Amino acid sequence: MVDVNRFKSMQITLASPSKVRSWSYGEVKKPETINYRTLKPEREGLFDEVIFGPTKDWECACGKYKRIRYRGIVCDRCGVEVTRTKVRRERMGHIELKAPVSHIWYFKGIPSRMGLTLDMSPRALEEVIYFAAYVVIDPKDTPLEHKSIMTEREYRERLREYGYGSFVAKMGAEAIQDLLKQVDLEKEIAELKEELKTATGQKRVKAIRRLDVLDAFYKSGNKPEWMILNILPVIPPDLRPMLQLDGGRFASSDLNDLYRRVINRNNRLARLLELNAPGIIVQNEKRMLQEAVDALIDNGRRGRPITGPGSRPLKSLSHMLKGKQGRFRQNLLGKRVDFSGRSVIAVGPTLKMYQCGVPREMAIELFKPFVMREIVARDIVQNVKAAKRLVERGDERIWDILEEVIKEHPVLLNRAPTLHRLGIQAFEPVLIDGKALRLHPLVCEAYNADFDGDQMAIHVPLSEEAQAEARILMLAAEHILNPKDGKPVVTPSQDMVLGNYYLTMEEAGREGEGMVFKDRDEAVMAYRNGYVHLHSRVGIATDSLNKPWTEEQRHKVLLTTVGKILFNDIMPEGLPYLQEPNNANLTEGVPAKYFLPLGGDIKEAISNLELNPPFKKKNLGNIIAEIFKRFRTTETSALLDRMKNLGYHHSTLAGLTVGIADIPVVDDKTEIIEESHKRVEQITKQFRRGMITDDERYNAVTAEWRAAREKLEKRLIANQDPKNPIVMMMDSGARGNISNFSQLAGMRGLMAAPNGRIMELPILSNFREGLSVLEMFFSTHGARKGMTDTALKTADSGYLTRRLVDVAQDVIIREDDCGTDRGLLIRSIAEGKEMIESLEERLNGRYTKKTVKHPETGAVIIGPNELITEDKAREIVNAGVEEVTIRSVFTCNTRHGVCRHCYGINLATGDAVEVGEAVGTIAAQSIGEPGTQLTMRTFHTGGVASNTDITQGLPRVQEIFEARNPKGEAVITEVKGQVTAIEEDASTRTKKVFVKGETGEGEYVVPFTARMRVEVGGQVARGAALTEGSIQPKRLLAVRDVLSVETYLLGEVQKVYRSQGVEIGDKHIEVMVRQMIRKVRVMDPGDTDLLMGTLMDINDFTDANKDVLIAGGVPATGRPVLMGITKASLETNSFLSAASFQETTRVLTDAAIRGKKDHLLGLKENVIIGKIIPAGTGMARYRNLEPHAVNEEEYLNPTVEEEGNEETTEVVVDTAVETVEETVE
């Protein structure tokens, strides 16, 4: 076999008969499989050892030669070669077909490749192949048409008319084979090119399709007649195994049944031909042979599938490849691995951020080889076998060895579903008792894990390189930021938030208020001995706290609380003292009002200060982000652990619980409800009198009850006690929100019926009072709908992620700078008055394209090609700049990927992105992962939607990425100019909008009900929407340029996500949208050798034009094509990637005809053939590096090998598409 890492590319072609014979080790002549008595393979059968190799290692069939010393000898008695039994997975056989047979993929696929080659309809082909009609192969001197079809009866009549031998007509695949041999590719191609110059309409479309197929045959060197099989390959027996079950029965692969049918029919046909049987019998047998081969290649493609026992359709070769259970997705793209385990997870509150708890019995099994090696190395036993016995006995000595082996050996933990890269992280194992894995509470958010019975899988990286990668790139303590938005993903939650909230509360008049302490220890001692309360405001000598004070502040007393002294204790030294929960204190330090000169009146100073709110979840998130910005990962993860411990400790001390008495009662609830009842009665009266319509009545009633609920909510908020545990949980962000609170204490309010419409009868009770039976029944509708929606949308969201990953998996950072001369002009994204994404957010972490100057002073804020940091972005916006030209993925010139400058910073690390980063996959995960939140959140918003026809949530995201025609489509103008008139036409129920511009006039028909976006006299740009709704991107592309469409799609995706409160970096959406507009359709080939109407990569198109322009010819013209992500995935240059995505047979059929070469540039193709992926440390520049310990000098000045210095060989994998199993020569 070929070394997989020496591959450069892989090609798939049609197999010629001679090729199939060269693969074969012998002909399979009999349908027998295994002898039922001896259980040995039958001679010349489907499992023959002579053809396929021995069933036992180094042993021939008759047993004359045993042992490895006879390797390579062919036994003179039984004819079996003495070799490894593994060859039974590699050696193929063949069947010599007694009549040619058509290959169903080429005759039945859409479009029918055979039909296009011969210019015959698939219907006519089918009649000929299945012996229902004759086709004229050579009319000779008769007036019959070449390739004309005639029935049996017509054929006889023509024979009588013109005489025997006056023309040649045949039926069956043999006839088609003769016709295919007659095809003169060069001549046909030339004729079609001529025809295209004049053809229009349907004729033109057909000519383009035929030209495409004929050109593919011509360029690839495949012969059209190879689509007809004269010889059928038999795949190796170990790929279609036959196993004995207990009870003497056999379980066999369906392929064996299908091969047996073919062999039986073939042998019967041979016998009939020997006997010179009547023509009709031979014909029938040939037709049956054709059907048997069809079933073997693709059962069920034509007619009824062949069924096995229990009328189950048999799985043919095509089914072995297709779908989730097919070869590609089941065995090649992901395999089950050894050194792995899974268990339930439990919380590990005492763990450090980089640790996880692994049960002892799991660890000993996972690390068995390492333990065994160490046992032998310590001379406890002499050999590995004895060491294994020692481990399996559970000897006392192994546990100490295990402790040492796992030290600094990271393991990977994974939770399904792995929606983004944080679904697999590395930890250092800590041995624990019990059987559950222990997980650090802070990484739960990244995994989306909780401890209600979730399970996780654990994997052990074995090699030194794998361990190094796990430790350096995947350690959980390093993953502070979320790759989708660059915000911290490990913020404290629940108890941790509550503890820190309680700790930083301030109260007036508690014991010890006004005391002054010389340092932290004295304050803590006073608190421990009960002299001062955590929340009491006290003074402390400023210079005793190790913080960045000014000289003036150092000699004063700081007014704070003991809780805040403890809270600031865990913060890094360089951070200001945190007294107020706001960003100003975090960045600039404590305000002056909290400092008291020595000897000042502390009681008076305290009484003049207002009470500060405590630190909530959001504040903690901001603190973590700031610390990450200043101190990076190591310090941040240490702080997070300290914050976690402090939070747990103080939420325990606070003893916050929830009792029924903690739910407050609203005194005037009855009056509020009475008032609403009266108003609803008035509304109903108005309706009965015919003053309002039913819809108006319904809207008024629901609005009234909504108002009642809000009124109660306001009362609750106004009267709430800040020390009420439920209020504290809600206010701190630990759990629950105001809506939960008002359902407990106010009223539940309006509910949705099963059809989604809001019911007019509200639930007046709250959970404290308890619901009546009817109210309880009403609430169940919403709960049930919530559950079903969640289940359905999870699947939708997962499928969206899969399509996104597929289309962008080969987008990798390939170079430092592509040197593009284009940039993207960006401004903030807004919808009406609502800001969707500010300019500051969009600028952060990108490179500028042009110099940015202050609009008033003209001073340079930032030069071209410079990285815009958070501070620079703020400076640009504060200067009043409204639009900036930046480097963007849209305008990047890098082939097969993006360059570092056009991408900007890697949001997951906050640093500039490195070459080799798989940004396509990251982008796909960042958009797909929040998909589940989208849909679920659309149902939480109550009320009647104002414009129901506009899609929202996940369906809208799918609509955008699949480039579908949107629901509620807006009418756009193709003319830039002024709206001169809007006329209403009552008869057709439409409006007409007239736009006049320099280039001409436009008249647009708009539905009567559409809401207008423009008014008479208003100016409109080309491609501007005249009505409310979504613009159809393909129509916009026809009117405007590619960049406008890309910008529009980017804005639309952001609108959906941001409206649901999900933040995603622009660059992720840019990567996906760019993949949708990578192709060009050739409109006029000029002097290039491109074909008209072909869809091709924009880079290849440019290259072809470059060559022609250099030679002084006329370049080709093309039109950019916007494709949905599914279509874009299938149109990728890699046939391996496309075939493993969807429509496997269609992709492979097409690839084989074209003789496609896969250059293995993406990730999927390399995973499929088992080669290291060309991203990250798998890029050529990191290969062949020996891992070793380095000294400091070497570490600071590394030497990196340049790309492209490895030897690679071109490997042509010539695949008979019939036997899709790869055979590499």
Swiss-Prot record:
Enzyme nomenclature, EC number = 2.7.7.6
Q: Where does Mg(2+) bind?
A: D450, D452, D454
Q: Which GO terms describe its cellular component?
A: DNA-directed RNA polymerase complex
Q: Does the keyword Protein biosynthesis apply?
A: no
- GO biological process per UniProt: DNA-templated transcription
| Any one Gene Ontology molecular-function term assigned to this protein's record | DNA binding
- Name the enzyme group at the top EC level: transferase
Binding positions for Zn(2+) 2 per the UniProt entry:
C818, C892, C899, C902
Free-text cofactor note: Binds 1 Mg(2+) ion per subunit. Binds 2 Zn(2+) ions per subunit.
User: Which transformation does this protein catalyse, written as a reaction?
Assistant: RNA(n) + a ribonucleoside 5'-triphosphate = RNA(n+1) + diphosphate
Q: Which cofactor does it need?
A: Mg(2+); Zn(2+)
User: What keywords are annotated for this sequence in UniProt?
Assistant: DNA-directed RNA polymerase, Magnesium, Metal-binding, Nucleotidyltransferase, Transcription, Transferase, Zinc
Q: Which positions does UniProt annotate for Zn(2+) 1 binding?
A: C60, C62, C75, C78
Under the subunit heading, UniProt states: The RNAP catalytic core consists of 2 alpha, 1 beta, 1 beta' and 1 omega subunit. When a sigma factor is associated with the core the holoenzyme is formed, which can initiate transcription.
User: Record's family?
Assistant: Belongs to the RNA polymerase beta' chain family.
Functional note: DNA-dependent RNA polymerase catalyzes the transcription of DNA into RNA using the four ribonucleoside triphosphates as substrates.
Q: What is this protein called?
A: DNA-directed RNA polymerase subunit beta'
**Protein's organism:** Streptococcus pneumoniae serotype 19F (strain G54)
Output the lineage of the source organism: Bacteria, Bacillati, Bacillota, Bacilli, Lactobacillales
Chain's gene name: rpoC
